[in-house]
Amino acid sequence: MASKSVVVLLFLALIASSAIAQAPGPAPTRSPLPSPAQPPRTAAPTPSITPTPTPTPSATPTAAPVSPPAGSPLPSSASPPAPPTSLTPDGAPVAGPTGSTPVDNNNAATLAAGSLAGFVFVASLLL
């Protein structure tokens, strides 16, 4: 009788591990582009601490012009709109990966049916 209970416990462990392995979860996120190799970092040169002489102002500052120069665009004119750009870079897939996602699969129903069948089978072994 002890060997039968060991077999039943092993079978229950197998059912539990398979149910955990088949449970839907978030898909792993990976970038479709390879990661670029980073160049080795070099130490930045230390700046010298010699004081820089301050230039003496030789000319008086001039006032800013009040009106824009002739031929320049007026501030009220709007720039043309930017051309439309795609949201995905060139060469990237338009849609997501072709694997199943948690939204569009029915693993939950299959998992529940398989678990119920497993429990019924184990219960029939015990009786």
UniProtKB/Swiss-Prot annotation:
The keyword Ribosomal protein does not apply. The modification Pyrrolidone carboxylic acid is found at residue 22. It is a lipid-anchor; GPI-anchor. A lipid is attached at residue 107 (GPI-anchor amidated asparagine). Keywords: Cell membrane, Glycoprotein, GPI-anchor, Hydroxylation, Lipoprotein, Membrane, Proteoglycan, Pyrrolidone carboxylic acid, Signal. Residues 25-39, 48-58, 66-86 have a biased composition (Pro residues). Residues 1-21 form the signal peptide. It is found in: Cell membrane. Residues 22-107 are annotated as: Disordered. It comes from the Eukaryota. Residues 108-127 form a propeptide. Proteoglycan that seems to be implicated in diverse developmental roles such as differentiation, cell-cell recognition, embryogenesis and programmed cell death. Belongs to the classical AGP family. This is Classical arabinogalactan protein 10. It comes from Arabidopsis thaliana (Mouse-ear cress). The gene is AGP10.
